[in-house]
């Protein structure tokens, strides 16, 4: 059976919605990026601050301070959301910077979620530990799908639970003392995002599934 057309409704709808969300986000970050660049703040500096904050948040959570850790995690997300805008505003956007940013994002995710796993295991909170481990694994899969798809030439900027959404949901859940509820939301969101990205890439590909196998 042949593949769906490249402009299939599912693919087009996902990409249009994601494009609108990115445009809205860009209207907020671009002015801030220009202001920070004029102040001499560098994109790599912001990336480093974000990573340090995430590592600190993970350590705070692991040592029994999830509320403070949630607040720090939210704050650490701010420089991470602005480093790309600063790089563009300063004319220093590069593939090396994009690569570094992607690696740091994965390390930041791992730091906070690993902190939750440690916190939960020490206190015998099985549900929380399991959810955090699943969200961590699925978050890495979400990122891998995009990286692999783009390396093959496919557009894959879709998903209801990309990194900014994950940082906000998890940070607020920890801050408000509802970590398990937040993790359930993230689990559902990351599963949906995995499916969205697979569908988008599948419908852009030339080879469809062989239903006779």
Regions from the PLM with identified roles:
Residues 2, 38, 46, 55, ...:
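Structured catalytic core of nucleotide-sugar glycosyltransferases
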Residues 2-33, 102-213:
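A feature for the membrane-embedded catalytic helix bundles of lipid/isoprenoid biosynthetic enzymes
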Residues 16-19, 23, 40-43, 66-69, ...:
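Residues at secondary-structure transition points
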Residues 30-42:
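Cytosolic juxtamembrane amphipathic/interface segments immediately preceding
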Residues 37, 61, 88, 150, ...:
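Short polybasic/polar patches that bind polyanions
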Residues 40, 60-64, 115, 175-176:
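Helix-loop junctions at the membrane-solvent interface of multi-pass transporters
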Residues 47-96, 126-137, 179-189:
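Membrane-embedded alpha-helical segments that form the functional core of polytopic membrane enzymes
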């Amino acid at each position: 059976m042949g593949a769906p057309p490249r402009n299939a409704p599912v693919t087009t709808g996902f990409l249009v919605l994601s494009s609108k969300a990115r445009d809205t986000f860009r209207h907020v970050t671009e002015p801030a990026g220009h202001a920070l660049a004029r102040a001499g703040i560098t994109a790599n500096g912001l990336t480093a601050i974000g990573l340090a904050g995430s590592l600190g948040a993970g350590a705070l959570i692991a040592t029994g301070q999830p509320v403070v850790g949630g607040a720090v995690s939210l704050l650490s997300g701010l420089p991470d959301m602005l480093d790309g805008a600063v790089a563009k505003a300063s004319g220093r956007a590069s593939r090396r910077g994009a690569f570094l940013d992607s690696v740091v994002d994965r390390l930041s995710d791992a730091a906070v979620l690993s902190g939750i796993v440690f916190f939960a295991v020490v206190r015998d909170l099985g549900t929380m530990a399991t959810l955090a481990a699943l969200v961590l694994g699925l978050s890495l899969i979400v990122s891998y799908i995009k990286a692999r798809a783009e390396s093959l030439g496919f557009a894959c900027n879709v998903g209801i639970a990309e990194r900014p959404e994950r940082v906000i949901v998890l940070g607020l859940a920890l801050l408000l003392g509802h970590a398990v509820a937040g993790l359930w939301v993230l689990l559902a969101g990351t599963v949906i995002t995995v499916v969205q990205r697979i569908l988008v890439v599948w419908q852009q590909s030339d080879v469809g599934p062989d239903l006779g196998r």
